C-alpha cells in the first residue's frame, strides 16, 4: 500500500483547518489581552472632574464698569475686573522700570477694559482683598493682601509689600464680545 502524504494545505491553496484554528486562537487571544489591558490604559486618562476644571467660560456682559467678579478655575480664584477709563490711564502711566516685577499694562490684558488674573498673592498664597465694593484696595487702588500687606495696582502688579511677583495672568481668550474662556 502506498502511504498517503499529509500536507498543510489542500491542493487549491485554501487554508487548512489547523491554520484556521491558529488564526482564530490568535485573534481571540489578542482581543482578550486588549480587554485585560484597557482598564490600565484608561486609568491614566484624567478624571472627568479634572477635565471639567481645565477651562472655565465666563459671561462678562453683566459686569458693570468698575466692578469685578471672582470665578474658580483649577481650584483657584480668578479675578475678572471691568476697569474704568481712569484705571486704564493710571495703569498705563506707570513706568515698568519702577516696578519690582516689570510688566506693562498692555502685556497683562488683551482688551484694555478687561483684566483677568489669578487672585492668589505671590507671597504666601493668600487671597487679596479688593474685589468687593467695601474691600480695602491698598495704596494703588487695586488689591490688598491682608496676610502680610502686599499692595497691587489696578493691573495686578506688585507695588508694595513682600510679594515678589505680579498676580499671574492665566491663559484666556475672548470667544466673543461678552464671553471669556479661561484655560
UniProtKB/Swiss-Prot annotation:
Q: How is the cofactor bound?
A: Binds 1 [2Fe-2S] cluster per subunit.
UniProt-recorded name of the protein: Ubiquinol-cytochrome c reductase iron-sulfur subunit
Q: How is the protein disposed in the membrane? A: Single-pass membrane protein
Q: What class of enzyme is it?
A: translocase
List, alphabetically, the Pfam families matched: Rieske (PF00355), UCR_Fe-S_N (PF10399)
Residues in the signal sequence: none
Q: Which domain of life is it from?
A: Bacteria
UniProtKB keywords:
2Fe-2S, Cell inner membrane, Cell membrane, Disulfide bond, Electron transport, Iron, Iron-sulfur, Membrane, Metal-binding, Translocase, Transmembrane, Transmembrane helix, Transport
The record places domain Rieske at 88-181
Misc: The Rieske protein is a high potential 2Fe-2S protein.
Q: Answer yes or no on keyword RNA-binding.
A: no
Segments traversing the membrane: 21-41
| Binding positions for [2Fe-2S] cluster per the UniProt entry | 121, 123, 145, 148
Cite the record's note on assembly: The main subunits of complex b-c1 are: cytochrome b, cytochrome c1 and the Rieske protein.
Q: Does the keyword Magnesium apply?
A: no
Q: Where in the cell is it found?
A: Cell inner membrane
Q: Name one GO cellular component term.
A: plasma membrane
The record describes the protein's role as: Component of the ubiquinol-cytochrome c reductase complex (complex III or cytochrome b-c1 complex), which is a respiratory chain that generates an electrochemical potential coupled to ATP synthesis.
Q: Which organism is it from?
A: Rhodospirillum rubrum
Which catalytic reaction applies to this protein? a quinol + 2 Fe(III)-[cytochrome c](out) = a quinone + 2 Fe(II)-[cytochrome c](out) + 2 H(+)(out)
In the record, what terms sit under GO molecular function? Answer: 2 iron, 2 sulfur cluster binding; metal ion binding; ubiquinol-cytochrome-c reductase activity
Q: What is its EC number?
A: 7.1.1.8
Q: Which InterPro entries match?
A: Rieske_2Fe-2S, Rieske_2Fe-2S_sf, Rieske_Fe-S_prot, Rieske_Fe-S_prot_C, TAT_signal, TAT_signal_bac_arc, Ubiq_cytC_Rdtase_Fe-S_su_TAT, Ubiquinol_cyt_c_Rdtase_Fe-S-su
Amino acid at each position: 500500500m502506498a502511504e498517503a502524504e499529509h500536507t498543510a494545505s489542500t491542493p487549491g491553496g485554501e487554508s487548512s483547518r489547523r491554520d484556521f484554528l491558529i488564526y482564530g486562537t490568535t485573534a481571540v487571544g489578542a482581543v482578550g489581552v486588549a480587554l485585560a489591558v484597557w482598564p490600565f490604559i484608561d486609568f491614566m486618562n484624567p478624571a472627568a472632574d479634572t477635565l471639567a476644571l481645565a477651562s472655565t467660560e465666563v459671561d462678562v456682559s453683566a459686569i458693570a464698569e468698575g466692578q469685578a467678579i471672582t470665578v474658580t478655575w483649577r481650584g483657584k480664584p480668578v479675578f475678572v475686573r471691568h476697569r474704568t477709563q481712569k484705571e486704564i490711564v493710571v495703569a498705563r502711566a506707570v513706568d515698568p522700570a519702577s516696578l519690582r516685577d516689570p510688566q506693562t499694562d498692555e502685556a497683562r490684558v488683551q482688551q484694555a477694559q478687561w483684566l483677568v488674573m489669578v487672585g492668589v498673592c505671590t507671597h504666601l498664597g493668600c487671597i487679596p482683598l479688593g474685589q468687593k465694593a467695601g474691600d480695602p484696595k491698598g495704596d494703588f487702588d487695586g488689591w490688598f493682601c491682608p496676610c502680610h500687606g502686599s499692595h497691587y495696582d489696578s493691573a495686578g502688579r506688585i507695588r508694595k509689600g513682600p510679594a515678589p511677583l505680579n498676580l499671574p495672568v492665566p491663559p484666556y481668550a475672548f470667544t466673543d464680545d461678552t464671553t471669556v474662556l479661561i484655560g
